[in-house]
């Protein structure tokens, strides 16, 4: 009798084992309840219900089978645990996979499958949960398309700019809470791509650009390293990173709740950590700020690149380096200068390439360097094996210097920063004679300086009196006259740390007056070509333009050779700093972009029709649209004015000025300009705001289409909705987007007469009246990096000019 009971209990034990663990799939007739699991056929992975610390909250997940403690690699219901003991995972009538929380309904779903012939769910040998059509065998859904915090071999991170599809890793909130946490790991759509970890919208860590077999910011991945990843990018705006299994071991890559990326494998007993990042303090994004260099081998970890000094010296001394560095000697760049203001490149070895790089298709380092030298916006370049030429047109951010490995980065400096030193022996041997020469020279210099200053004071005083006398207060009511001392104090003596940017006429500085009012100071360079009459015209005429969508001039300063224009300060800088930044662009959703478009249109209408002067701007572009503290747009940079008698509405000039890509065809080719030239530029500006793409950088596929060409095809094919920046798709009204694309195309039509005037434009933007169909625009081919910068100014003397016509 005892033996029979033993046999009976053995039978029950074996039966319960086969019930609780099965390699069969989930079907409509055979759901997966709590207490039962589904295994992969190779026995490596298991799917089932689990909880933390014996909690009633149950999750459906996948884990490595037989490994203690359990390591969960995927969770279905991350945000919504089930609590009913009768919960189960089942196939629905339409073929989708559903998690039922007992009588509480559906807690999670794989989405609509719409399969009439039925489907089943299986766990593959790669740990991928797959829903399969019973009739065709087609995969209807898979967990690898909906990753959590872990990648398994054969899984993929990806992006597709055309469809907006993106596959990322998202961290858990904590070790025992699988809901979505603070960190996201993704590959960026840059060329070449890189791995980027963000905390919210803030960069936290990045791998550096991909170079055929390695990430350049990971020294471990040298030329001899065979990594566990494969990266693909194509010209259609899609890319992927696939995790490979090169040794048949159990392995995983994971984004932890603390934001670290960990690669590990199982040796049969324990998990072995192969790679973790960020690990060193230099791995954290931007720890040394713009133009700061984080050195891994020596303390203190942050230093400035050669030719740069700390921006906030006291903070720097305290170990707060995030303010970064600024140039010690300002660059004077005219493309290919060879004089005393010529620029040179200083090479820095063993560098993790900084962020915000741009790829340029040059075949050797010489061409790469030459192109960067001729592009005044290019601040640095690197020619990297497996990539080719990279250039930097923005601040060098998140640069790291390794003890070994890394890349050679060449940084643009003023020639004076690389001046050589005398040899110590030569200095010692000639110290007496040199001292004598210095003393004699100093005495001579003092005498000469006295004579020059004496004569200059007379000339300068007379010049200042003449200029100030010519500038009558009644001509410029409300305009303030500032003395040089006030402006020098406000701008910290034109400190480079106060520099906001470089315009066609000279640098622009931020200043703060004694009453606390912030200002922007345009310091007109002596080489800008401005004469007395032109300068007076700008002050007298532009000061009379008052509109909420125009930057307002507050005053001027004339002392000696200095000519300064003082404008109201714009807190949020220019529109391009938001629109073309992968993170800041999220701050301007579709409603805000539409407000900006309408505000710019109102400003142009005022210039063309509502002011007592008729003003044709001739250089409307995204960098000339400034944003105030409420993100209201203001048109800026009118440049030098020129007055015409009468009421002309068009003119012709031999001095074609403006920015390539924004200029109307008739203006660029013949010099003929009118208010319709500004309308064309506004149309280009609209397409940039809608798409989030630069007119000078956009390309689509192998055909190198312009943004205008792509917008035209988009409007013809889909009404223009697929032109929209995917980052703002959730906040848009599709009909508004399609209408704006059509208006933009109406503005860039080839014939000026076909383009709307500003009154018609405002009506189009603020009503729902019917729009005429646009004619196919001229697809002007834009120049790439091999010849020019991102913004090519077409001008005789490199000035950005507006034209002011009397009514």
Swiss-Prot record:
Residues 333-413 form the PAN domain. Residues 25-144 form the Bulb-type lectin domain. Residues 25-426 are extracellular. Disulfide bonds join 282-294, 288-302, 368-389, 372-378. The chain crosses the membrane at residues 427-447. It catalyses: L-seryl-[protein] + ATP = O-phospho-L-seryl-[protein] + ADP + H(+); L-threonyl-[protein] + ATP = O-phospho-L-threonyl-[protein] + ADP + H(+). Its EC number is 2.7.11.1. Residues 278-314 form the EGF-like domain. Keywords: ATP-binding, Cell membrane, Disulfide bond, EGF-like domain, Glycoprotein, Kinase, Lectin, Membrane, Nucleotide-binding, Phosphoprotein, Receptor, Serine/threonine-protein kinase, Signal, Transferase, Transmembrane, Transmembrane helix. The active site is at residue 619. It is a single-pass type I membrane protein. GO terms for biological process: recognition of pollen. This is G-type lectin S-receptor-like serine/threonine-protein kinase At1g61420. It comes from Arabidopsis thaliana.
